[in-house]
Amino acid sequence: MASQFINLKSRLLNPYVVFAVWMLCTVWICITQSLAGPQNYNNFLVFRGVFDHLFSSLPLYEPYPLEYGDINHYGPIFAFIIAPFAVLPPWLGMSLWCMSLSLLLYWTVRQLPMPVVLTSLVLWLTLNDFYGACFKQQFNIAVAALVVGALAMIEKRREGWAALFIVIGTFVKIYGIVGLAFFFFVRRKGRFIGYMALWSAMALLLPLLFVSPEYLWSQYAAWAADIVQKNGENMFCAYTNISLVGCVRKISGSPAYSDLLIIVPAMVLFLLSYLRTGQYKHFSYRLTMLASLLLFIVLFSSGSEHSGYVIAALGMGIWWVNFPPPARGRLEWTLLLLALFASFSYNLLPTKFYRGVFVAYALRSLPFFAIWLHCIRRLWREDFAVTDVLLDYITLPAADEAANEAAESRPARPGDGLDIVCPCYNPAPGFVPALARSYAELCARYPDKRLHLIVVNDGSTDG
């Protein structure tokens, strides 16, 4: 039975299986939505309208009831992102848009320098919320992908791509600006700042090739006013403000206070984690920072919708896989199961309770808030040198780069690789964390060496 479970687990985490399931879900959405007709892909029609209206110099933030329901809330630069899909027949443009969102999120998660089985598990944990967001053609999928992609490109020292992802996310939906939180992890900061300035200038000036400056500046002003107005409308809206700030607002029933009373303390809690500068070098620390940012976007925004939880679910998935299995206790399992229950709540809860209580009071946010607090606690207290080793992040970035530079500057010589044999007979409690910490210290001390840790065990219980 145990071997069958292991075989099933290995098959489910196989990247080809994950990709096949991911794309089958996307294709199913494209087919069903196309056959259902335009009334089922209204969001895409709104996006398409941004392209048509900008190039006709029409207002971007006013209703067009003859074209679609709802109003656009994205920045003017979005017209250029949606352009390749807007010129196609609506059903085809919608299908390719969903396919592009799907591939973008899948690709960016796979770009994280993690073992393949871990990125596969992240995708599985995100799948249900991805399906809901893709069903509504939501740009939130791209927001999640751009934030993850920014860190992935920083890890690969591709500052230009990282800056581009942050600029696109910021100029389309503001949320992308959280990618700047990774600035302290950038090795070539001057290069990164230069690319940020370049891409920002292009995002601001590109529309001027097609519209007048007066029109463009008026639309940016209208966008700012729309964001403020939308924030007020979201306050007690049933199907928006599905966030922690919305939960507190709807339970209290009071419109008198500012959301900043909740957001500012949360920002302080998050920013305090930057004081642990010695942890910056550990990839698991940076991953925990990424998870907390993805959760923060949803938990502390009045614009959070159910489809926006693809961002929080991705954060939850990254939080989960960034745990060494021995560290997953009852608390961690409880938080994971509660978050998954919230994700499937539409199918699991009675309709009356779901709409009248669960949605009405934004209760979906609570397990994700608990996970965010868990991330903050880890950022404050954990020794991520141990986590890096236990999670097989063994080729630490600094050591890996130093070894590559050494290999380029001279031919490989005997002694570049070192085998460390560690007898392990009836180990004392705490042996594994101590061993991991020592190994991490050796990696830092000998960055030009390839260290291979060989643990010899006689089959004793704790080995």
Predicted region positions:
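Transmembrane helices and adjacent periplasmic/lumenal helix-loop junctions
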Residues: I166-F184, S301-I311
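Aromatic-enriched
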Residues: Q33, W320-A398
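Primarily membrane-embedded glycan-assembly and transfer machineries that use lipid-linked glycans
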Residues: A2-W161, V186-Y309, A313, F384, ...
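Short, well-formed alpha-helical segments that are part of the catalytic scaffolds
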Residues: P427-Y446
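Cell-envelope/extracellular polymer assembly enzymes that use nucleotide-activated donors
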Residues: D416-D419, H452
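A conserved acidic beta->alpha catalytic loop
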Residues: N457-G463
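Non-catalytic membrane-proximal stalk/linker segments that position and tether the catalytic domains
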Residues: L390-P414
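Short beta-strand/turn micro-motifs composed of small residues
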Residues: C422-C424, N457
